[in-house]
Amino acid sequence: MQAFLKTGKLSATDKPSSSGVKSTKKKPPAPWVEKYRPKTIDDIVDQGEVVQVLRECLSGGDLPHLLFYGPPGTGKTSAILAAARQLFGDITRDRVLELNASDERGIQVIRDKVKTFAQLTVSSSRPDGRPCPPYKLVILDEADSMTTAAQAALRRTMERETRTTRFCLICNYVSRIIPPITSRCSKFRFKPLARENVIKRLQEVCEAEGVDVGDGQVLHQAVDTCEGDLRRALTALQCCQRLLGKITADGLIEVTGLVPEKLVNEYLNVKNYSELEKFVEKFLMDAYSASQLLEQLSAVVVTSGHLTNKQKCSISEKLAVCSHRLLDGGAELMQLFDLGCAIIVANNNP
């Protein structure tokens, strides 16, 4: 303090040091799907054929236009991002344009943003002097949601800018991509991940995070709950861990929005209108999803050993009608009552 009053500066001994411990900045928590996203194509789970072809393309430094399709959560986006990192290294951000479902991808965006990026000419070396492919990469995630006009505009850009740009389209349904684009791309189908590989990957992530999953049964439930989607399963496990402090079977049902099996069976076994009215009122008060109930009910009806074929047919027919109405914006209350009445009739007339 004396030194400060005389010179206006703190001396080396006067600097605030708290307890002499260096302050360490804590990293903010990151989503597990990003934190453990594969860094190289060899880290991609259960897509051996795709990885082999990509490895050969990368070894020659040449990449064709690509079309990745398959179920969600199978590694399509991770594969192309890993390939881009291996191709471009430290300049990946400058060489890659990624557009996904959150971006506007109408015809105007294709004509302006994508076309402008594709027309840029790039060098064949990095700032550090290492060789680099002389082209850029445009990644269009969920390309099957693009309009036909936007896809037609993209086709023209793909034709004209092949020398300086490669395109990778990612979609769930290849049938929604126009033929002129599919004919210009090398198509790769990402198959559903094997159950044991998904569980193994979930186990690795949980061990890395220090999360106790007991005998692993909860991981099997996570795979069943998320229908084999590795991304959804990882997100569900992280949500359960962050919200509840531990991963449990009931916690997974809660964070994924599933309807408890007890409620599904209760709805399927209603015998009169009074029971139905009480169930629907409590179901909606608890804020469960009617669409989710109908989806789970469909699987239960088909596999049920207590219902006759006649009962299954009548319930399934009404279930399909009510599901369609919900998709069209119908009221959940009305559809639950309508289907419930059909279930009552079926239960009372086996």
Predicted regions span which residues?
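P-loop/Walker A NTP-binding region and its immediately flanking N-terminal helices
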Residues: 1-183, 187, 319, 323, ...
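Short conserved motifs of the RecA-like P-loop NTPase core
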Residues: 135, 201, 212-225, 247-253, ...
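Amphipathic alpha-helical repeat elements characteristic of tetratricopeptide repeat
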Residues: 35, 179, 196, 216, ...
